[in-house]
């Protein structure tokens, strides 16, 4: 029998540019920056003071692949809940602090893995940096300097007229310099804007002027569809240039959706080992089957599969056989039937009514073999006879 490869390429695809060299920090047990893989994070939408609901949402995010979670802390009740949440969370918890510097200290004392501060709206922030640096250093707590276009310091708005890339970068580097004066460099930085073009230019300038790890984000990106497009465009541009160490896709949607999009962006750029990938044609007048329905049913049937499997669902004989051959598993449909391919070889032909069922069965067989041979989490391909 001809050998069939059931794994992934032994040499992963390289990003378009070499990764920017940045210093590495520890956010709890997770390394960010340096040679650490680009991580994906999100933010809870619950009231942090509701410990049960917040931990439940963190558990859902963790299951979806989230690696860092941020929680809001606008009140004393929220601050009081941080210790329990930080202790019980499966992933590092970052406290998101605005307006009140006292909550920065509360978050550090509570054992949060990191604290995000917004220099544009924390009262007397510059005067508090020395104390924050001392407390953070004592507890080993990194600080994220999170600059947002919507809350930029008034003096910078007066200087630049609006939230330009230069204004965002100046704000971030100024605050970083204050921490540096107190020998604190356990820092990561974000300079977010809701315009992807402004955001990309800001991060490019920032990357050229410092070696701190960078948290990428398009702030207030919008509803799911619009926000996904904005984030994909901005992150794709920066990550393909080697810029970015951790990402947060901001969507007006459930937080789990942010993780799905973020992971897909990294997989698409070769920055994360791909998991299940459905390749399907957009359909046209040549299609002899309902490609939309087939693709949706196959996707639903394989939801949750973690192995790096590429499945092609093709609707006609033009590109169908070629795409199916390039996939781990695929179907080229036409004339009321479908040819099922495994690694380029036709293994059977089935009626159209059996295509989805057959693809799912074959995918499960391949996944089981891959797991048995140690390739489920992205190890080199194996060959079976």
Swiss-Prot record:
One of its GO terms (biological process) is isopentenyl diphosphate biosynthetic process, methylerythritol 4-phosphate pathway. Keywords: 4Fe-4S, Iron, Iron-sulfur, Isoprene biosynthesis, Metal-binding, Oxidoreductase. Its EC number is 1.17.7.3. Pathway: Isoprenoid biosynthesis; isopentenyl diphosphate biosynthesis via DXP pathway; isopentenyl diphosphate from 1-deoxy-D-xylulose 5-phosphate: step 5/6. Binds 1 [4Fe-4S] cluster. Its cofactor is [4Fe-4S] cluster. GO terms for molecular function: 4 iron, 4 sulfur cluster binding; 4-hydroxy-3-methylbut-2-en-1-yl diphosphate synthase activity (ferredoxin); 4-hydroxy-3-methylbut-2-enyl-diphosphate synthase activity (flavodoxin); iron ion binding. It comes from the Bacteria. [4Fe-4S] cluster binds at residues 281, 284, 316, 323. It catalyses: (2E)-4-hydroxy-3-methylbut-2-enyl diphosphate + oxidized [flavodoxin] + H2O + 2 H(+) = 2-C-methyl-D-erythritol 2,4-cyclic diphosphate + reduced [flavodoxin]. InterPro entries: Dihydropteroate_synth-like_sf, IspG_bac, IspG_bac-typ, NO2/SO3_Rdtase_4Fe4S_sf. The keyword 4Fe-4S applies. Belongs to the IspG family. NCBIfam families: ispG_gcpE, PRK00366.1. Converts 2C-methyl-D-erythritol 2,4-cyclodiphosphate (ME-2,4cPP) into 1-hydroxy-2-methyl-2-(E)-butenyl 4-diphosphate. This is 4-hydroxy-3-methylbut-2-en-1-yl diphosphate synthase (flavodoxin) 2. It comes from Streptomyces avermitilis (strain ATCC 31267 / DSM 46492 / JCM 5070 / NBRC 14893 / NCIMB 12804 / NRRL 8165 / MA-4680). The lineage of its organism: Bacteria, Bacillati, Actinomycetota, Actinomycetes, Kitasatosporales.
């Amino acid at each position: 029998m001809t050998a069939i490869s059931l794994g992934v390429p032994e040499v992963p695809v390289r990003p378009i540019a070499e990764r920017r060299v940045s210093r590495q920090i520890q956010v709890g047990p997770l390394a960010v920056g340096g040679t650490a893989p680009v991580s994906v994070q999100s933010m809870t939408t619950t009231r942090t003071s509701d410990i049960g609901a917040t931990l439940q949402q963190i558990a859902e995010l963790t299951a979806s692949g989230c690696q860092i979670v941020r929680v809001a802390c606008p009140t004393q009740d929220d601050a009081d809940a941080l210790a329990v949440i930080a202790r019980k969370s499966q992933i590092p918890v970052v406290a998101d602090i605005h307006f009140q510097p006292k909550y920065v200290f509360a978050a550090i004392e509570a054992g949060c893995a990191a604290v995000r501060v917004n220099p544009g709206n924390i009262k007397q922030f510059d005067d508090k940096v020395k104390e924050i640096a001392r407390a953070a250093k004592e507890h080993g707590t990194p600080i994220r300097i999170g600059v947002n276009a919507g809350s930029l310091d008034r003096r910078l708005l007066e200087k630049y007229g609006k939230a330009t890339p230069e204004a965002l970068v100046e704000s971030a580097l100024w605050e970083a310099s204050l921490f540096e004066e107190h020998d604190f460099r356990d820092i990561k930085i974000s300079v977010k804007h809701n315009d992807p073009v402004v955001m990309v230019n800001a991060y490019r300038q920032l990357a050229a002027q410092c070696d701190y790890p960078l948290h990428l984000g398009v702030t207030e990106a919008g509803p799911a569809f619009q926000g996904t497009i904005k984030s994909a465009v901005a992150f794709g541009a920066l990550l393909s240039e080697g810029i970015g160490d951790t990402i947060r896709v901001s969507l007006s949607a459930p937080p789990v959706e942010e993780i799905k999009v973020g992971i897909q962006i990294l997989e698409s750029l070769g920055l994360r080992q791909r998991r299940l990938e459905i390749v399907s044609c957009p359909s046209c007048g040549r299609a002899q089957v309902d490609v939309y329905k087939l693709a949706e049913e196959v996707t639903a049937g394989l939801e949750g599969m973690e192995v790096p499997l590429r499945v092609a669902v093709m609707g006609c004989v033009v590109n169908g056989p070629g795409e199916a051959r390039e996939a781990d598993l695929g179907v080229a449909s036409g004339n009321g039937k479908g040819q099922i391919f495994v690694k380029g070889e036709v293994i059977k032909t089935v009626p159209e009514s059996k295509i989805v069922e057959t693809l799912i069965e074959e995918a499960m067989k391949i996944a089981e073999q891959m797991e048995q041979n140690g390739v489920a989490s992205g190890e080199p391909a194996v060959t079976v006879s």
